[in-house]
């Protein structure tokens, strides 16, 4: 074999090996898996995003249910709570909507009355008891 032919052949073999490695068959994510750990994922998110995540009052949550998100259906849950503001005063009740994708929390954003106005809320004592100190464990 001549030198250019050997180079071409070697390049083709290496390219084929790299292509075989790159074509892993990842399973597509099922977007509408029922979120089983939704309360903990919401607690984790609120503990990072609330200014004062402890001593939350009047905490409620709805069970995840399929609802419309654009043209798709996704699991969502509503959360209502009264947390303290930057001045350490209770700010009043806040409604948030949690969107789930593939069984995990994807977004937790402010909810409109249309989104959570008819939610079947139940007490969420885990949020009211949230404690971040090591002595809490």
Residue ranges of each PLM-predicted region?
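Bacterial N-terminal signal peptides that target proteins for export
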Residues: 1-9
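Cystatin/cathelin-like cysteine-protease inhibitor module
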Residues: 22-137
